[in-house]
Curated annotation (Swiss-Prot):
Residues 462-474 have a biased composition (Polar residues). Coiled coil: none annotated. PROSITE patterns: ACT. This is ACT domain-containing protein ACR2. InterPro entries: ACR1-12, ACR2/9/10_N, ACT-like_dom_sf, ACT_dom. The keyword Repeat applies. It comes from Arabidopsis thaliana (Mouse-ear cress). PANTHER family: ACT DOMAIN-CONTAINING PROTEIN ACR2 (PTHR31096:SF50), ACT DOMAIN-CONTAINING PROTEIN ACR4-RELATED (PTHR31096). It comes from the Eukaryota. May bind amino acids. Keywords: Repeat. Residues 39-121, 136-213, 298-373, 376-459 form the ACT domain.
Length: 500
């Protein structure tokens, strides 16, 4: 028998540097220095994208970042975050503190592998967790009233069960990510011919009334294009990765540009009216200057404070291929001020007015696209094929358009959150909204008003006060959502279950 020899590698060799010089990433949690918040300090070897990874971890834990200082110039990375839990208190739970330390340390050790994978794929897509039971489908296009309903109806016609879906609309553009399975076998859809059929069907729906003068709708397979219809098996996600992908999709359809000025249909006109109404109340101000001495561009952002604000800003800069060297954030609970010292990934500052204008518009869009102004409807139902199609069709037929959707399946239940507005662009009369709960009994329906209060750090889902008198607005059409859903009782009543 021939002997086979190979070199021996000590398994501790990879950790030799850490044993000599200490761990490459140190995380400190300080609960003593400041009375009303916890200080999280991160010291690490500097790697491109590490700041985003740390912010993603804090974001996924629903922590509120009230102040932050970042410095990563040279070979070392130093971050300080002042954070509170979702209730506005200091972090006292030892398991939460240990999870932060472990998650950031693990993220740092895996950073080199992730960056190598991204380099090999030549892609900035977030690394998503594997969901072996679902097929991910991504869609982008020109938004119009009723499009969400048409998309969900198409899934029902294609015998696809929607297990999870998230959709944003902004400036008459739409981005949607859906995780589906075959409604008969409950397995991922991996047949190329069937995926092609799904692509063709959904492409037809999305492009049905798209203005030919608009370039905001693109259709193509994932391996060929960066936007349009994208399909792939086994793509799941954590919360912030899903949101980062939605940011990327909205950026790909240029939602930072104004909608087409001369819409050829009433549906596009209503989107334009919504956009104009939003622009009148815009509170985000972005400016860019240059630091000639150090070769930085200085980006300042003033806006209303809310949760995930820092994440939205940083992931947009990273996806636009800018490197953040220094940064500072502070907030007073109502307003937030952010400052970033950046260069392009090739080492240059923002020298042209055109590039500065594009960064300004993209950051404004990234901050504003998450803020939905409308009425939020929360429903919990027994999951079945066609449920989302039925719900969104009822809303569409009665003059409500969905501007954002979050759908999740937990066991046999489907948890649905729809942000809706009047199709004509007017505010929905809150008197009818307040009467919905009484009319819907025993069916449970949560109604939250997003018009009167922005999503601040004090409340992730702001609601209208029950004692507050809603501002009266002239309405061309008055209706009752309770009556609408009651008319569909034969089909829907057996599927709704209480959320509590």
């Amino acid at each position: 028998m021939q002997k086979v020899c190979w070199p021996y590698f000590d398994p501790d060799f990879d950790n030799l540097g850490e044993r000599i010089y200490g761990p490459p990433c140190r995380v400190y949690i300080d609960n003593d220095s400041i009375q009303d918040c916890t200080v999280v300090k991160v010291n690490s070897e500097n790697k491109q994208g590490l700041l985003l990874e740390v912010v993603q971890i804090l974001t996924d834990m629903n922590l509120i970042i009230t102040k932050s200082y970042i410095s990563s110039d040279g070979g070392w990375f130093m971050d300080v975050f002042h954070v509170k839990d979702e209730h506005g208190n200091k972090l006292t739970d030892k398991s939460v503190i240990n999870h932060i330390k472990h998650a950031i340390g693990t993220s740092r050790r895996e950073s080199d592998f992730i960056k190598a994978s991204e380099a090999n794929n030549n892609s900035l897509e977030p690394q998503l967790a594997d969901h072996g039971e679902h097929t991910a489908i991504e869609m982008t296009g020109t938004d119009r009233p009723g499009l969400f309903s048409e998309i969900f109806a198409a899934f029902a016609d294609l015998h696809c069960n929607v297990m999870e879906a998230h959709a944003w609309s902004h400036n008459a553009r739409l981005a949607c990510i859906a995780y589906v399975s075959d409604d008969n076998t409950h397995t991922p859809i991996d047949d190329p011919s069937r995926l092609a059929s799904i692509e063709d069907h959904l492409s037809t729906v999305i492009r049905a009334t798209a203005d030919p003068a608009s370039n905001s709708t693109h259709v193509g397979h994932k391996e060929n294009e960066t936007d349009g219809f994208l399909a792939g098996q086994g793509k799941g996600c954590m919360n912030s990765n899903m949101e980062r992908r939605l940011h990327q999709l909205m950026l790909s359809v240029r939602d930072f540009d104004e909608p087409f000025c001369e819409p050829s249909s009433l549906s596009l006109l209503s989107s334009k009216l919504e956009y104009c109404d939003h622009k009148e109340r815009k509170t985000t101000i972005v400016s860019i200057g240059n630091c000639e001495e150090r070769g930085y561009s200085i980006v300042t952002v003033k806006s209303k404070d809310r949760r995930r604000l820092m994440f939205d800003t940083i992931c947009t800069l990273v996806d636009m291929q800018y490197v953040i060297f220094h940064a500072a954030l502070r907030s007073d609970g109502a307003d937030a001020f952010q400052e970033y010292f950046i260069r392009h990934i090739d080492g240059r500052a923002l020298n042209t007015e055109g590039e500065k204008e594009r960064v300004i518009k993209c950051l404004e869009a990234a901050i504003e696209r998450r803020v939905c102004e409308g009425v939020k409807l929360e429903l919990c139902a027994e999951n079945r094929v066609g449920l989302l199609s039925d719900i969104t069709r009822v809303l569409r037929e009665n003059g409500l358009t969905v501007v954002r959707a979050d759908v999740e399946t937990q066991g046999q239940k489907s948890l649905n959150a729809f942000y809706v507005r009047d199709i004509s662009g007017n505010k929905i009369d809150m008197e009818f909204v307040e009467s919905v709960k009484k009319e819907m009994r025993p069916i449970h329906l949560e109604v939250k008003n997003e018009d009167t209060k922005i999503d601040t750090v004090g409340s992730d889902e702001p609601t209208a006060s029950a004692s507050a008198t809603p501002q009266r607005q002239p309405q061309p059409h008055r209706f009752s959502l309770g009556d609408i859903l009651r008319s569909q009782m034969e089909r829907l009543s057996l599927n709704f279950v209480p959320t509590k």
